[in-house]
Amino acid sequence: MAFLRSMWGVLSALGRSGAELCTGCGSRLRSPFSFVYLPRWFSSVLASCPKKPVSSYLRFSKEQLPIFKAQNPDAKTTELIRRIAQRWRELPDSKKKIYQDAYRAEWQVYKEEISRFKEQLTPSQIMSLEKEIMDKHLKRKAMTKKKELTLLGKPKRPRSAYNVYVAERFQEAKGDSPQEKLKTVKENWKNLSDSEKELYIQHAKEDETRYHNEMKSWEEQMIEVGRKDLLRRTIKKQRKYGAEEC
């Protein structure tokens, strides 16, 4: 998003709107983010875009995680991250400064590289890149979030009774393709009696209980490591109201 704002800043500095820079597009272009033509050079240009350096704490975490894993092979990732966070808090300022200085040095290099990168683009290229940048940013953000939650050991969501049934019956279902197998399983599920479905409903309830218990434990760990932003909204509200009552 920061890069997108930088791009838009270039357009503003030129004193022209997106529509003005695309004179001739006519009614096909209704907003700065509505495009009907995306040049092939998008990928190559975006690939050459400088990447922001990681923060001093994240640099420290990436460095320490393999060490902690080797020392504690049976420990969960969330526990390792909690220990690393504690180690960072206890780290003397003189040692933290090493990571902070490295970040500042890389940030300065990044600023120079991004400046040179933007100078190579024409206003029309900037216009065309905006949508691609936005799309890639949103996809990357979602993917990063998913990877982060996996790394932090967030519990898997509970399965429905139908999903439990699919997992059990899919492999043996008739069909030459996954789509055909799934269709068969779906039809078989519809034909089950309520009493036959009850077994899978019970499994789903047990999975719901498992998820609730694991999430409660996981969110307590996230609070310990300073990641309250990952709590469910209902939990955040409960903690907020609880604090107000105190």
UniProtKB/Swiss-Prot annotation:
Q: Which residues bind DNA?
A: 50-118, 155-219
Entry keyword set: Activator, Disease variant, DNA-binding, Mitochondrion, Mitochondrion nucleoid, Phosphoprotein, Primary mitochondrial disease, Repeat, Transcription, Transcription regulation, Transit peptide
Q: Which GO terms are recorded in the biological process aspect for this UniProt protein?
A: mitochondrial respiratory chain complex assembly; mitochondrial transcription; positive regulation of DNA-templated transcription; regulation of transcription by RNA polymerase II; response to hypoxia; response to nutrient; transcription initiation at mitochondrial promoter
| Residues the record lists as Phosphoserine modifications | 55-56, 61, 160, 193, 195
List, alphabetically, the GO terms of the cellular component aspect: cytosol; mitochondrial matrix; mitochondrial nucleoid; mitochondrion; nucleus; protein-containing complex
According to the UniProt entry, its GO molecular function terms are: chromatin binding; DNA binding, bending; heat shock protein binding; mitochondrial promoter sequence-specific DNA binding; mitochondrial transcription factor activity; RNA binding; sequence-specific DNA binding; transcription cis-regulatory region binding
Subcellular location per UniProt equals: Mitochondrion; Mitochondrion matrix, Mitochondrion nucleoid
Q: What is its main location?
A: mitochondrion
Tell me which residues form the transit peptide: 1-42
- Is Repeat a UniProt keyword of this protein? yes
**PTM statement from Swiss-Prot or TrEMBL:** Phosphorylation by PKA within the HMG box 1 impairs DNA binding and promotes degradation by the AAA+ Lon protease.
> Which residues make up the annotated site Intercalates between bases and promotes DNA bending?
58, 182
Domain topic, free-text comment: Binds DNA via its HMG boxes. When bound to the mitochondrial light strand promoter, bends DNA into a U-turn shape, each HMG box bending the DNA by 90 degrees.
> Which PANTHER family does the protein's record reference?
HIGH MOBILITY GROUP PROTEIN DSP1, TRANSCRIPTION FACTOR A, MITOCHONDRIAL
Summarize the subunit comment. Monomer; binds DNA as a monomer. Homodimer. Component of the mitochondrial transcription initiation complex, composed at least of TFB2M, TFAM and POLRMT. In this complex TFAM recruits POLRMT to the promoter whereas TFB2M induces structural changes in POLRMT to enable promoter opening and trapping of the DNA non-template strand. Upon metabolic stress, forms a complex composed of FOXO3, SIRT3, TFAM and POLRMT. Interacts with TFB1M and TFB2M. Interacts with CLPX; this enhances DNA-binding.
Q: What is this protein called?
A: Transcription factor A, mitochondrial
Species assigned in the record:
Homo sapiens (Human)
Gene name per UniProt: TFAM
